[in-house]
């Protein structure tokens, strides 16, 4: 059995295909979704979503949004997301370095919060390209 996974951003369809399972970062922790999952609506946190296809995992850097799970259909509306294969490792590492420096230099609460969110997004992009574990069926 499979799940129909759709990941949509305001500008484009990021993913639309059948998958075996997903592991999704929500505001209340990670959840695993298999076929015939109970219906659920959840807030998606900034984090890595793992997607199991036929015998292999793919990852996606998710930048927050909402997920609707209904039996075998998952629709995720995100602010932005990037598939692991679309992320340039050097650019991701540089963005992480810059975000860390910005957080260290942040003055005031607002700047610190914005810098912390930027660092979380940069860290998520790095984790997405380093988090594709092999799996066998």
From Swiss-Prot:
Function (record text): Produces ATP from ADP in the presence of a proton gradient across the membrane.
Name recorded for this polypeptide: ATP synthase epsilon chain, chloroplastic
Keywords carried by this UniProt record: ATP synthesis, CF(1), Chloroplast, Hydrogen ion transport, Ion transport, Membrane, Plastid, Thylakoid, Transport
Pfam families for the chain: ATP-synt_DE (PF00401), ATP-synt_DE_N (PF02823)
InterPro entries on file: ATP_synth_F1_dsu/esu, ATP_synth_F1_dsu/esu_N, ATP_synth_F1_esu_C, ATPsynth_dsu/esu_N
Quaternary structure, from the entry: F-type ATPases have 2 components, CF(1) - the catalytic core - and CF(0) - the membrane proton channel. CF(1) has five subunits: alpha(3), beta(3), gamma(1), delta(1), epsilon(1). CF(0) has three main subunits: a, b and c.
Chief location of this protein within or outside the cell: plastid
Keyword Membrane tagged: yes
SUPFAM superfamilies linked: Epsilon subunit of F1F0-ATP synthase N-terminal domain (SSF51344)
GO molecular function: ATP binding; proton-transporting ATP synthase activity, rotational mechanism
Membrane-protein topology: Peripheral membrane protein
Family: Belongs to the ATPase epsilon chain family.
Subcellular localization, as worded in the UniProt entry: Plastid, Chloroplast thylakoid membrane
Taxonomic lineage of the native organism: Eukaryota, Viridiplantae, Streptophyta, Embryophyta, Tracheophyta
GO cellular component: chloroplast thylakoid membrane; proton-transporting ATP synthase complex
Gene (name only): atpE
Cross-referenced HAMAP family: ATP_synth_epsil_bac
